[in-house]
C-alpha cells in the first residue's frame, strides 16, 4: 500500500508503469513522489478497468497489483524483441558512481554511438559493469544493459542530458583504410552490427512505451573535438545511416554539432558534401 506523500522506488515503478500504459504525468513525471498528479492518473486507470477509487489518497495493494498485471501483459506484447544473442542485465552489478542522477523519459530524445576503442575479449560480462554508458554491444553479438536508460551517465559530453549512450566494442578507424597510427583498426563483425541495430530499435521502443520520443542518432564526435573518430566511418555507415532511415531519426543534418564537437563528415555520409573530417 502507498499513501499520498510517500517517496521511493515503489512510487517510481508505479509512475513509470502508468505512463507506459498511456496515463501521462506531464507536470512532474516519474519523480518518485506520490502526489495528486499520480493519484489522478491512477483514478483514471481504475475507472478504465471498471474499478472505483474509494480512497483517492491511498493506493491499495490490490490496485498496485492491477497496474502491475496490466503493465506486464502490455510489456509481453511488445513487438520489438530484446536485442542480442544474449541480453545481459548488469544494472545491479554496475558501478553506481557512474550515475549522476536521473532524467524523465520525456527528456530522452536521442542515442549517442561510441566505439569502445578496445576489444574486451570473448564474453566477459563483468568487464562491462564499469562502463560509462547505459548500453553496449559486443563483437560476438551480446547486448549489455549497464544502467537504467533514465540514468544520467557522463558518456557523451553535451549529449549527456538527453541521450542514451550505446558503446560498440572494438577499435575502429575514423576513416576506413590503412591505419594512421600504431594500432591496427578492426572491422565491425556482422554480429556487432545486427546487435547494435537491434539495440537501437529496443531503446527507441522502450522510450516510446514510457511516454518519450527519440528523434536523434548522434556520433560522439558531434559533441567533442577530441572524439574525432568516434564511432568511425564503418560503424556509422553500417549502423547509424540505416537506422536513421528505418526509424525516422536524424543526426541533426549537415554541419550539426554542439560545443567543441565536429559535424558528421562527407566521408561518413556522402550526402554531406564539403563537411570536413
Predicted regions and their residues:
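Short acidic, glycine/serine/threonine-rich helix-capping segments at coil-helix boundaries
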Residues: 2-71, 215
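Structural preference for beta-strand elements that scaffold enzyme active sites
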Residues: 110, 163-165, 216-218
Amino acid at each position: 500500500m502507498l499513501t499520498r506523500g510517500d517517496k521511493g522506488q515503489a512510487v517510481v515503478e508505479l509512475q513509470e508503469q502508468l505512463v507506459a500504459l498511456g496515463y501521462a504525468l506531464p507536470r512532474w513525471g516519474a519523480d518518485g513522489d506520490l502526489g495528486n498528479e499520480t493519484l489522478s492518473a491512477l483514478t483514471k486507470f481504475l475507472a478504465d478497468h471498471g474499478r472505483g477509487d474509494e480512497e483517492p489518497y491511498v493506493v491499495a495493494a490490490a490496485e498496485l497489483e492491477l497496474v502491475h498485471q496490466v503493465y506486464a501483459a502490455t510489456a509481453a506484447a511488445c513487438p520489438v524483441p530484446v536485442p542480442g544473442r544474449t541480453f545481459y542485465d548488469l544494472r545491479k552489478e554496475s558501478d553506481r558512481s557512474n550515475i549522476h542522477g536521473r532524467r524523465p523519459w520525456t527528456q530522452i530524445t536521442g542515442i549517442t554511438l561510441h566505439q569502445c576503442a578496445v576489444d574486451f575479449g570473448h564474453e566477459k560480462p563483468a568487464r562491462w559493469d564499469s562502463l560509462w554508458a547505459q548500453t553496449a554491444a559486443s563483437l560476438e553479438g551480446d547486448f549489455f544493459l549497464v544502467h537504467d536508460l533514465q540514468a544520467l551517465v557522463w558518456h557523451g559530453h553535451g549529449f549527456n542530458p538527453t541521450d542514451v549512450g550505446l558503446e560498440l566494442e572494438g577499435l575502429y578507424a575514423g576513416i576506413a583504410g590503412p591505419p594512421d597510427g600504431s594500432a591496427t583498426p578492426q572491422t565491425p563483425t556482422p554480429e556487432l552490427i545486427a546487435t547494435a541495430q537491434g539495440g537501437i530499435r529496443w531503446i527507441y521502443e522502450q522510450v516510446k512505451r514510457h511516454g518519450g520520443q527519440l528523434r536523434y542518432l548522434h556520433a560522439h564526435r558531434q559533441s567533442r573535438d577530441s572524439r574525432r573518430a568516434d564511432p568511425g566511418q564503418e560503424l556509422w555507415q553500417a549502423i547509424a545511416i540505416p537506422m536513421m532511415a528505418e526509424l525516422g531519426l536524424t543526426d541533426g543534418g549537415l554541419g550539426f554539432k554542439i560545443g567543441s564537437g565536429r559535424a558528421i563528415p562527407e566521408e561518413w555520409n556522402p550526402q554531406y558534401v564539403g563537411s570536413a573530417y
